[in-house]
Regions:
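N-terminal beta-strand motif that seeds the catalytic metal site of vicinal oxygen chelate
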Residues: 1-22, 66-68, 115-150, 156, ...
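Vicinal oxygen chelate
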Residues: 2-5, 10-19, 47-48, 60-135, 141, 163-165, ...
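Core segments of cupin and vicinal oxygen chelate
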Residues: 3-11, 15-55, 140-178
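Short loop/beta submotifs within extracellular cysteine-rich repeat domains
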Residues: 35-36, 56-58, 78, 160-162, ...
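A short linear hydrophobic-aromatic micro-motif
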Residues: 35-37, 56-57, 88-92, 180-181, ...
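A short beta-turn/loop motif at secondary-structure boundaries
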Residues: 40-41, 62, 94-96, 185-187, ...
């Protein structure tokens, strides 16, 4: 089965390092996320919040942040495949007596981790139970060269669509378990979690009533019901008016 998986396997979580998991949990729960039960594979304090589509891993340790984390059973035996794809591993922890994990970065510094197994159990929640943020759409990553980003990510199991100009210039890529996009660093210099809703203006108003602080929108994005938030862990949350 592993041989049929994309090189990185299935998307597991958007991992962030934070010194204060509790503050992050309170923030995301206020937005309508649900805690997931975590296992004991990791040695550091760890929590997971989910909106039914997206799982956010909160890690109290020192590591590249944020990280796109995937699961591929038998990842240790797949190490030669990464080398064949020209990927230089920055982490390679494999063997029978350890929790297998590899890591690498894309050409623009985005960290990627591939684990041998899940580290949480998804909560009993359906994708129709939408958080106050709307429907999770994609992770948008800064990349100065869209062609180079596409050339790196497509062999990992992603397929690029045509470059889009609205609501900001970006190159979307899809996969079975995660959609990503690339935006120019001048648009926004950090990764963003992108959410969409046909009623986003009302959602943004509700968030304002709850006292959630809004940041200036990324360059080129009009207000028009859109908004940008920042979580206590530093994650940027882009809320866009319109269907996914």
């Amino acid at each position: 089965v592993a041989a049929l998986l994309p090189l990185v396997g299935r998307f597991h979580e958007f991992s962030v390092a934070t010194p204060d998991i509790r503050a992050c949990v309170e923030f995301y729960e206020q937005l309508g996320f649900t805690q997931a039960a975590t296992g004991d594979a990791l040695s550091h304090p760890y929590g997971v919040l989910s909106d039914g589509r997206l799982h956010l891993g909160l890690h109290q340790h020192s590591a590249p942040t944020p990280t796109l984390t995937f699961v591929r059973p038998g990842v240790g035996s797949a190490v030669p495949a990464y080398a064949a794809a020209g990927i230089e591993l920055t982490v390679c922890r494999t063997g029978e007596d350890v929790f297998n994990e590899i890591g690498f970065s894309d050409p623009f510094g985005q960290a990627v981790t591939v684990l041998e197994a899940r580290t949480y159990s998804p909560p009993a929640r359906t994708a129709t139970e939408v958080s106050l943020l709307g429907d999770f759409a994609q992770v948008s990553l800064p990349a100065a060269d869209f062609a180079a980003a596409q050339a790196f990510w497509e062999p990992l199991g992603f397929v690029a669509a045509d470059e889009a100009q609205e609501p900001y210039a970006h190159l979307p890529l899809t996969s079975d378990t995660l959609d990503i996009a690339f935006h120019q660093p001048r648009t926004f210099e950090r990764p963003m979690l992108v959410f969409r809703s046909a009623a986003m203006a009302a959602r943004v108003a509700r968030l304002g009533e709850l006292g959630v602080e809004m940041l200036p929108l990324p360059r080129g994005i009009r207000a028009d019901g859109n908004a940008l938030l920042e979580a206590p862990d530093g994650t940027a949350l882009l809320l866009l008016q319109g269907e996914n």
